[in-house]
Amino acid sequence: MLLRFTKMHGLGNDFMVLDLVSQHAHILPKHAKQWGDRHTGIGFDQLLIVEAPNNPDVDFRYRIFNADGSEVEQCGNGARCFARFVLDKRLTAKRQIRVETKSGIIELDVRSDGQIGVNMGAPRLVPADIPFQAPAQALSYQVDVDGATVELAAVSMGNPHAVLRVADINSAPVHELGPKIEHHPRFPARVNVGFLQVIDRHRAQLRVWERGAGETQACGTGACAAAVAAISQGWMDSPLLIDLPGGRLSIEWAGPGQPVMMTGPAVRVYEGQVRL
């Protein structure tokens, strides 16, 4: 059978989006891995699946597969593309959309200027909730990587993140440390790794090594986690502008127990069909 799909991106973080509300198919990890290959498939960072909800209090269910076939809990840039997609495809007329994810409910707001705001919910900082192995919660942790000590913050935005502060974003060891921290035994579910350079109290630059995808052009949940770490440690103040290789995100966070608000664009690239 042929399935219709849409290729989209949020700041260069690119997605294949499938509507399984009006189409019906059973998507497996092997399909995500096959389609995600940039040489022999369609090529993407993540596959986003739009489904009818299980919960009557939400509008849609949102599933996410990495290009390596692993299903993950959350994707912030994908959430913005999800909102743009369901409106463009007339699956809803709402501009405030509630979506069920593997890690909970998020709220999407499609604004008149085309930007999309996402209420990502409150960050989780208790180590067991991330998950991260540590005896107690702290603002930062020291982790042994190949005999060297790396200081990092650990945050869950529905998916796990490690945040490292660096002096120079251009020389940050993203490809050296990223995969080692991603697979570090203290992160039993693996982890996304952000490298953050603080510019001033409200501006920063960020590169992210994504779990199951490698370095991407942008990572929405990574920007949220970096903002939480920077505000918690007193490096920065809300609101924040975070520049990633693919563009800029606006992040607001009022402090512990409060939701993180992310705002940025979502772009449709092309439509296609793929054989299942």
From Swiss-Prot:
Write the protein's name.
Diaminopimelate epimerase
Q: What is the lineage of its organism?
A: Bacteria, Pseudomonadati, Pseudomonadota, Gammaproteobacteria, Pseudomonadales
Record keywords: Amino-acid biosynthesis, Cytoplasm, Isomerase, Lysine biosynthesis
**Which organism does this sequence originate in?**
Pseudomonas fluorescens
The EC designation for this entry is: 5.1.1.7
Family from the record: Belongs to the diaminopimelate epimerase family.
Answer yes or no on keyword rRNA processing.
Answer: no
Q: What NCBIfam families would the database entry show? A: DapF
Q: What does this protein do?
A: Catalyzes the stereoinversion of LL-2,6-diaminopimelate (L,L-DAP) to meso-diaminopimelate (meso-DAP), a precursor of L-lysine and an essential component of the bacterial peptidoglycan.
Q: Which gene encodes it?
A: dapF
Q: Where in the cell is it found?
A: Cytoplasm
The principal location of this protein is cytoplasm
GO MF terms here are: diaminopimelate epimerase activity
Pathway the protein acts in: Amino-acid biosynthesis; L-lysine biosynthesis via DAP pathway; DL-2,6-diaminopimelate from LL-2,6-diaminopimelate: step 1/1
The Gene Ontology biological process terms listed for this entry are: lysine biosynthetic process via diaminopimelate
Assembly state and interactors? Homodimer.
Task: Write down the chemical reaction(s) this protein catalyses.
Answer: (2S,6S)-2,6-diaminopimelate = meso-2,6-diaminopimelate
Residues at the site labelled Could be important to modulate the pK values of the two catalytic cysteine residues: H161, E210
At which residues is there a site annotated Important for dimerization? Y270
Q: Which residues are named in the active-site annotation?
A: C75 (proton donor), C219 (proton acceptor)
Per UniProt, substrate binds at: N13, Q46, N66, G76, N77, N159, N192, E210, R211, G220, T221
Question: What GO terms fall under cellular component here?
Answer: cytosol
